[in-house]
Amino acid sequence: RARNTMTLSPTAQVLLALLVLLATFFGWRWWVSAQAKRRAGEPARPSLLRAAIGFVTNFFDTLGIGSFAPTTAIFRLLRVVPDELIPGTLNVGHVLPTLLQALIFIAVIHVDPVTLVAMLASATCGAWLGAGIVTRLPKRAIQTGMGIALLAASILFLLANLELFPAGGDALGLSGGLLVCAVIVNFALGALMTLGIGLYAPCLILVSMLGMNPIAAFPIMMGSCGFLMPVAGSRFAASGRYDLRAALGLLIGGIPAVLLAAFIVKQLPLFWLRWLVVIVTVYAAVLMLRGAFAERTVVPRGGTEPL
């Protein structure tokens, strides 16, 4: 089983300090933007509905399902936010709950420092350096390929859970060729984030198939988004192209949801974690295949959308 610990390694302390700095930077940028919106007469107090949306979507985000696709669907269904303001609202409102996820999982889930830093760095570099490459690729073809690959991986993991196929291990780190493989794949996943193709489910299945405990994926995938989202969110906040009430609702409802869901994930036995991987992977595969054949695509998460 994964070791949950509050004795922070030096690596974890540095990562947490950087995340706190990013949260402070984003919070200041958002506060300046919100004050300008209030002076312009835009209402700021979120309704109970908006807070409830934030709670539900961030709860499932913390479980690895993702928040942007469900939030987009709810916003459109209930007509809470105009379509043109949805990308900014998501990128602003979900930043601090995502940062909280990263802080919690890096603090309480012990992962080998070399593995954690290498995979965080590779995803981050992939999102920044790979953006110019993958944005020229056909998104529909990538979604189709990723969807089929995830379905195949979920079948293999389902067989493993049914003891019909060798199961993954419970390691908390990688070395040698396995680490190199993980870094390369995570770089590619980071690059694909710029197309709105999620990191969470592929990262969960990658870590599990390489013989690691699935819970080790949570600090990796949450940390990846935690380092990328504040920058994208700050840009949207500065532009003012977001709905203030809805964004505040995502924040207010999202924080307690993250705390509750993180406690559930931390306490899950390995057996149930492996079944969670199957559920998340199948969900992501269906979402990608549906997006590949739908006229409308899921709104990208400023380069960091999990699903």
Regions found by a protein language model. Name each.
Residues 39-46, 163-186, 296-307:
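Alpha-helical multi-pass membrane helix bundles of inner-membrane/thylakoid proteins
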Residues 10-13, 137-150, 241-244, 268-276:
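Loop-to-transmembrane alpha-helix entry segments
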Residues 44-127, 179-262, 266, 279-282, ...:
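Small-residue-rich hydrophobic segments that form or flank transmembrane alpha-helices
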Residues 265-280, 303, 307:
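Membrane-interface module
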Residues 7-8, 105-113, 160-174, 209, ...:
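Membrane-interface helix termini and inter-helical loops of multi-pass transporters
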Residues 21-38, 100, 131-140, 148-170, ...:
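Transmembrane helix exit motif
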Residues 6-18:
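Feature marks short, highly hydrophobic, charge-poor N-terminal signal-anchor/signal peptide-like helices
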Residues 1-5:
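Short, Lys/Arg-enriched N-terminal segments with co-localized hydrophobic residues
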